[in-house]
């Protein structure tokens, strides 16, 4: 595998983004981008040479847009916008998210609509390639006029200001620039604004959440299948004929996943002709629930792939026509709505899993010992593990409230409608932590349920999952310290050990 990738500006796919980040590939900008970048920069220079007044080049910003700035102050203007806008707060964004922000910003500026120099783009590439990640506080953006505050923090080190993180250590920007083979840059006209305008932070946060959510989706299909077998559930509701006549492709696909996972289960065959007619909805309706989740995730993926390549700067430079146009591509409404949809999906993944845990521990529904432990009363078993799952599911319901319906005017009402895209995307990561906790508890509960069916075994596919769980967590024959077991399984989930692809290998 090549250790670098050639970035063709505007042509990132979700697959290529995953590959770049997972394999830690370095970036080389395609040479066919050079002339577009130069032409765009020359268009900006021409505005200055001809003493025209154009927003963002020789004016103030936001509600100060009517203030004209003299030519001898333009470099100071660009430095000032970075310094004044770097006022974020909160925990620092993790390195993998900052790497993705850098990648998206490089992709954005390299398409030749921002008027910046190639030298500036190469500096961002050097930071990316040397894994020198600007320290970016997580809070401060409202997702309109772009992610101004966090992108200002991204830009600070280019000026020799602020701090960066390298190999997990926070160091000064000056040290970081040396590691990347750089010296502090003096920004030219429009460059500060081009760095700050854009939706790369909200897009990166949403993409990062989407990639992890895909793993959680697969884990939920697996844990839900295990719960069906542990609770002596039926595989009839997964019959393809049922789903074909409804017609939703995602539901059809989800049902196929359940059929494939449950095929060959000795437990299922042992009660195929029992008197139980129908299972509770949390078992029976899984293809309908998870099909809807998959449908939402596919929509979110399509939206974010477009946004990963989108130009969200302002003003925009159209070098071929010599025009510089002001618009509103920096408004993150579509990202906010996509993040809200993903939040609904995550809430449903966790919420339905919590219901299955509740079913498994209830002897009246599952037919298993109360709270999945022998000598219940002396032992509490999974009683309080379910309470933890319920707590996380309830948190997710509150966190799933749509952020895109919220708006607070800023910049003296010049920016009077904002998207809240960044907070919409940021909250997804808290939901991911909650959902992975719930799924870890379901996996533990379902595997414990299988113990009571021995010597009968689950399907060959699901037995691989059972063995993986048992490799780090033994059977619960009596009460013990529970929290470490949950964390062990959460780690396996987030390390993608419970994926459908893994089962096919």
From Swiss-Prot:
Cellular location(s)? Cytoplasm
Which sequence positions carry the modification called 2,3-didehydroalanine (Ser)? Answer: 145
Organism ancestry? Bacteria, Pseudomonadati, Pseudomonadota, Gammaproteobacteria, Legionellales
As given in the record, the signal peptide range reads none
Please state the gene responsible for encoding this protein: hutH
Q: Give me any GO biological process, just one.
A: L-histidine catabolic process to glutamate and formate
Q: Give the organism the record lists.
A: Legionella pneumophila (strain Corby)
Q: Which EC class does it fall in?
A: lyase
Catalytic activity reported = L-histidine = trans-urocanate + NH4(+)
Q: Which UniProt keywords apply?
A: Cytoplasm, Histidine metabolism, Lyase
Q: In which pathway does it act?
A: Amino-acid degradation; L-histidine degradation into L-glutamate; N-formimidoyl-L-glutamate from L-histidine: step 1/3
Query: Is Lyase among this UniProt entry's keywords?
Result: yes
List, alphabetically, the PROSITE patterns matched: PAL_HISTIDASE
Identify the PANTHER family for this entry. Answer: HISTIDINE AMMONIA-LYASE
Please verify whether the record's keywords include Cytoplasm: yes
A Pfam family that this protein carries is: Lyase_aromatic
NCBIfam families the UniProt entry points to: hutH, PRK09367.1
Name the cystine pairs: none
Which Enzyme Commission numbers does its entry carry?
4.3.1.3
Q: What protein name does the entry list?
A: Histidine ammonia-lyase
Post-translational modification here is noted as: Contains an active site 4-methylidene-imidazol-5-one (MIO), which is formed autocatalytically by cyclization and dehydration of residues Ala-Ser-Gly.
User: Which GO cellular component term is one of those annotated?
Assistant: cytoplasm
Q: Which family does it belong to?
A: Belongs to the PAL/histidase family.
């Amino acid at each position: 595998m090549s250790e670098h990738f050639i970035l063709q500006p505007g042509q990132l796919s979700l697959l290529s983004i995953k590959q770049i980040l997972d394999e830690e590939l370095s970036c080389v900008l395609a040479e066919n981008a050079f002339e577009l970048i130069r032409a765009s920069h020359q268009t900006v220079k021409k505005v200055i040479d001809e003493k025209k007044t154009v927003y963002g080049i020789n004016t103030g910003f936001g509600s100060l847009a009517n203030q004209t700035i003299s030519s001898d102050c333009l470099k100071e203007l660009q430095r000032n916008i970075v310094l004044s806008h770097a006022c974020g707060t909160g925990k620092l964004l993790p390195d993998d998210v900052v790497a993705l922000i850098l990648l998206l910003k490089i992709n954005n500026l390299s398409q030749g609509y921002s008027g910046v120099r190639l030298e500036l783009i190469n500096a961002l590439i050097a930071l990316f390639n040397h894994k020198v990640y600007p320290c970016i506080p997580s809070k401060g953006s409202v997702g309109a006029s772009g992610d101004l505050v966090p992108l200002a923090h991204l830009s600070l080190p280019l000026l020799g200001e602020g701090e960066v993180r390298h190999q997990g250590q926070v160091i000064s920007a000056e040290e970081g620039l040396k590691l990347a083979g750089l010296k502090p840059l003096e920004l030219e006209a429009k460059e500060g604004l081009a760095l700050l305008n854009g939706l790369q932070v909200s897009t990166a946060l949403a993409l990062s959440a989407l990639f992890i959510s895909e793993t959680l989706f697969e884990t939920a299909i697996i844990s839900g299948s295990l719960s069906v077998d542990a609770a002596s559930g039926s595989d009839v509701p997964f019959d393809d004929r049922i789903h074909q006549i409804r017609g939703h492709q995602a539901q059809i696909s989800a049902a196929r996943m359940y059929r494939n996972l449950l095929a060959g289960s000795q437990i299922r065959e042992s009660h195929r002709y029992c008197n139980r007619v129908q299972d509770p909805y949390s078992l029976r309706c899984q293809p309908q629930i998870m099909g809807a989740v998959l449908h939402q995730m596919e929509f979110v993926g399509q939206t974010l792939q477009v946004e990963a390549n989108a130009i969200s700067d302002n003003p925009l430079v159209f070098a071929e026509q010599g025009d510089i146009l002001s618009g509103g591509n920096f408004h993150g409404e579509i990202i906010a709505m996509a993040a809200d949809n993903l939040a609904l999906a995550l809430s449903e993944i966790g919420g339905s899993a919590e219901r299955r845990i509740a079913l498994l521990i209830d002897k009246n529904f599952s037919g298993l010992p109360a709270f999945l432990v022998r000598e219940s009363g002396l032992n509490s078993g999974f009683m309080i593990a379910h309470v933890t799952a319920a707590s996380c599911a309830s948190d997710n319901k509150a966190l799933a409230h749509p952020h895109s319906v919220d708006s607070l005017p800023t910049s003296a009402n010049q920016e009077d409608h904002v998207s809240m895209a960044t907070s919409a995307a940021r909250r997804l990561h808290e939901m991911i932590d909650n959902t992975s906790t719930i799924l870890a508890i379901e996996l533990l509960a379902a595997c414990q349920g299988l113990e009571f069916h021995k010597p009968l075994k689950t399907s060959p596919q699901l037995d691989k999952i059972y063995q993986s769980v048992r490799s780090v967590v033994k059977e619960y024959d009596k009460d013990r310290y529970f929290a470490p077991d949950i964390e062990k399984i959460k780690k396996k989930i987030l390390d993608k050990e419970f994926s459908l692809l893994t089962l096919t290998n």
